[in-house]
Each structure stands twice: as C-alpha cells, then as structure tokens.
C-alpha cells in the first residue's frame, strides 16, 4: 500500500493517458485515494483549502483514471487519466499546469511561456 507522509499526504503525478503529457502534480490523503479507487474519478486533497476536492467537479473536466501506479518507495502515485469536457486541467484554463518555463540568461532567472503549450 502507498506510504503517506507525516501530514497524511502522498504526492500524485497526473499525466494524460493518451499522449503522456504531464498535466498536474497534486496530493492525496487516504480518503482521496479511497474515493479515487472506488469511483475511478480522481480526487485530491487541497493543501491550501484543507479540503477534499473532486478534480473537474465544477468545470466538468473530470479526470477518469485509466491506470494508477506507485513508485519503488511507495511514497508517490502516478495517475494516467482521460480528461472529460474540453480538456483543461489547470485552473487557468490550460491543458497542463506546467505551461511556464524557467529560463536563466545572463545570471537572471525568468519565467516564460513554454513554446509547446497553448496561451
């Protein structure tokens, strides 16, 4: 069984089951994992709001879990999902939460829009 940290959470890495794109990184507590396994729909624990959250419940972009794996230490999960609706995963309306690239130039670090993500 997965190993939760001292806060009762486990990191969840989420990718698109079709093309493997990294969509988001979230956290699950025991209840979120149980609900995910029971329903086949991804549930997470919001650390900022301190509440359970069914991803896509408001937007209609539910995440149906196709496959769930754990790493060798059993302290991280990998969810391969199909996203319902028009497909965004990020609260900004983008497909992936990883749409910004960290670049370093001339000793300065900046965030830029990644060229492989929609605006």
Curated annotation (Swiss-Prot):
Keywords, in A-Z order: Amino-acid biosynthesis, Cytoplasm, Histidine biosynthesis, Hydrolase, Magnesium, Metal-binding, Zinc
Chief site of localization: cytoplasm
A Pfam family this chain is assigned to: PRA-CH
Binding residues for Mg(2+): 71, 73, 75
EC number: 3.5.4.19
Location in or out of the cell: Cytoplasm
Pathway connected to this protein: Amino-acid biosynthesis; L-histidine biosynthesis; L-histidine from 5-phospho-alpha-D-ribose 1-diphosphate: step 3/9
Name of the protein this chain belongs to: Phosphoribosyl-AMP cyclohydrolase
Species assigned in the record: Brucella abortus (strain 2308)
Gene: hisI
């Amino acid at each position: 069984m997965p190993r939760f940290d001292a806060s009762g959470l486990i990191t969840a890495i989420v990718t698109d089951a079709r093309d493997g794109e990294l969509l988001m990184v979230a956290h699950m507590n025991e209840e979120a994992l149980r609900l995910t396994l029971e329903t086949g729909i991804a549930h997470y624990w919001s650390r900022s709001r301190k509440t359970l959250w069914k991803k896509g419940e408001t937007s209609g972009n539910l995440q149906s879990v196709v496959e769930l794996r754990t790493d060798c230490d059993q302290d991280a999960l990998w969810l391969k999902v199909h996203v319902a609706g028009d497909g965004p995963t990020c609260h900004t309306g983008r497909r992936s939460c990883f749409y910004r690239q960290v670049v370093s130039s001339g000793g300065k670090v900046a965030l830029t829009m990644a060229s492989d993500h929609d605006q």
